[in-house]
From Swiss-Prot:
Gene name for this UniProt entry: EXPA18
Alphabetical list of Pfam families matching this protein: DPBB_1, Expansin_C
Membrane topology field: Peripheral membrane protein
Full protein name: Expansin-A18
Chief localization: secreted
Gene3D superfamilies, alphabetized: Expansin, cellulose-binding-like domain (2.60.40.760), RlpA-like domain (2.40.40.10)
GO terms for biological process, alphabetical: plant-type cell wall loosening
Signal peptide range: 1-21
Length: 249
């Protein structure tokens, strides 16, 4: 117990990201290759994680953590539980990762494998995982907590779809990192409630082409921001629009 207490004190002294929850127990593996290139894309819909502001410190989340995509973009501070696996852990180190993908159960394995439907498990990019674990260990017990996300620049909106179907991908979100609810307003409409389609993609079934668009986004931390006329009237499907606004929580 003494080792883990000392480790936690050292980590807490180093961490500048304020915790959003207490320490919880879980496990972690890695995927995506030594350069992490295999982690690009994923079930949150972010695509190239470098372009979208997330980088290589990312993880695929097991079912209870992924929460059907509601946790996409959330940040987690992770340390290896040295007391449980001294031969597999790097003592005194920590890493903050963003949830960018889903780690599904493998029903060819007993109980669905490491990413089963009840286990809190992070399948991290290999470069991120090797900050806390020894490569030969493969899987390690961890302690984790959700923390505030820090991003460079403002929130971004990418619009895809066709005709009366708009699909909006929200990226580079700081604070809690994830969306609780979202609405859109055209220059000729009132506010229209959107719904999650998949991952960080939110949908609207309305004919908004040719209109300037505004968004209201409420984070899972409870902060609401209105992005007024962030999309000009001449927009086209496939475009990304950057803002100067950002979430604190």
């Amino acid at each position: 117990m003494g080792n883990i207490v000392l480790q936690l004190l050292a980590i807490l002294a180093l961490c500048i990201a304020p915790a959003r929850s207490g320490w919880l127990q879980g496990t972690a593996t890695f995927y995506g290759g030594a350069d992490g290139s295999g982690t690009m894309g994923g079930a949150c819909g972010y695509g190239n994680l470098y372009d979208q502001g997330y980088g290589i410190n990312n993880a695929a989340l097991s079912t209870p953590l992924f929460n059907n995509g509601a946790s996409c973009g959330q940040c987690y501070l992770i340390i290896c539980n040295y007391d449980k696996a001294p031969s597999g852990c790097r003592m005194g180190t920590a890493i903050t990762v963003t949830g960018t993908n889903f780690c599904p159960p493998n029903y060819d394995l007993p109980y669905g494998g490491w990413c089963n439907t009840t286990r809190p498990h992070f399948d991290m990019s290999q470069p991120a995982w090797e900050n806390i674990g020894i490569y030969s260990a493969g899987i390690v017990p961890i302690l984790y907590q959700q923390v505030k996300c820090w991003r460079s620049g403002g929130v971004r909106f990418t619009i895809t779809g066709l005709n009366y179907f708009e699909l909006v991908l929200v990226t580079n979100m700081a604070g809690s990192g994830s969306i609780a609810s979202m609405s859109v307003k055209g220059s000729s409409t009132g506010w229209i409630q959107m719904s999650r389609n998949w991952g960080a993609n939110w949908q609207c079934l309305a004919g908004l082409a040719g209109q300037a668009l505004s968004f209201t986004v409420t984070s899972t931390g409870g902060q609401t921001i209105v992005f007024d006329s962030v999309v000009p009237a001449g927009w086209s499907f496939g475009q990304t629009f950057s803002t100067y606004q950002q979430f604190d929580y």
